[in-house]
Amino acid sequence: MTGTSLLTNSWPLLRWFVSSATLTVPQAAGPVAFSFIALSLTGSTSGGAAMILAMTLAQIAGAVPLARLGRNLPAATMLRLLISFRAMALASITVCAAYGASFEWLVLFAAAAGLVNGAAYGFLRTLLNHFVLASRLPRALGIASTLNEVTFVLAPVAASGLATVSPLLALLAMTTLGALPAIVVPWTAAVARVEGLPTLHGKLLSPEVLLWFACAAASGATVASIEIGAVALALNFGYEPALAITFTVPLCLASVAGGIWISVRNRMASRTAVVVQLAAMALGSALAAVNHSMVMTVVGTVLIGVVLAPLGTYFSLALDTLAPPERRPELFALLRTSQAGGVVFASALLTFVSLSSALVWVTALMTAVTLAVALAPTRLNFQNRA
């Protein structure tokens, strides 16, 4: 691809980045926005947690069927349809809240909104292959990961600020921003198909694919255990709940730094590097589980955060080589679903067992997948792409 064509492709790629950054606004702002709505309607924030749970479970249920449903449509078209459906579901939540409808309707529409999240990510990630050379995918994914972390930092803050004015205003803003991918995502017809990605044919859910799904689930559970358990961690060390940011902010900043590092390096990691990164995440989780001191726990969260983007980038690149082009939306949807499954696992642990026990279980899971990758056959070690 010539320099001229790269320049031509920069505008569609920029639109893809905007779509990627705004795709997750409902997931990022939802916990805060839904909690404020639940508080205003029921007098308790627990309804907000029910809405998020419904959204997450629906995402897991809908990922594969919706990805398969859109297999014969252009990825951009299917993405627009999915995001439009989600926008209507979120708008329905706003209308129901405005008119004081039964709270069960809000939970139902939250599930409808979440139904498309996994598949939408699958189609959006597939589109990236149309706008970027294979050799530049690590950089593009690193940038996307960095923008995603920025979204998860800023969206809850914005939702909280708007909700203090009006919970409905927070919902309206979340719905509007979450609908942007349907407007700005570029059409695949606008850019020539990017070649250069090797593809391995065979079963879609091969042992290699399942291994990376397990790693994604474990990393999702590890991050969620810190984010969801942040308030409990602060209380555990005798601090006010507001100091939960002592754990979440370093986690997010370290993740942003990891995304920037991947963007600058622009290379697919070796399997040895991936094992080291997985081990670092397991060590970070172990430091938090030890419950020795706040400093040690913060160091653990930084270790988790700094390898989050490199690992996510590697999982995505590895799966690129393991599926036929027409099955990539399905595979990427399953990748996002695996991460969501990890979040559900961590949430369940924190609900039914103590914080320390939950962190021990998550550490054990992270250690198990680290050993699995370290001992896996060498065919899982894909060649670096410069």
Which residues fall in each region the model found?
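A late C-terminal transmembrane helix in Major Facilitator Superfamily
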Residues: E326-S356
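Cytoplasmic helix-loop-helix junction between adjacent transmembrane helices
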Residues: F109-V150
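C-terminal ends and interior cores of transmembrane alpha-helices
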Residues: S84-G100, A280-H292
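Helix-to-loop junctions at the C-terminal end of transmembrane segments
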Residues: Q59-A76, A163, A257-R271, S354
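Helix-loop boundary and gating motifs at the non-cytosolic
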Residues: T2-I60, K203-V249
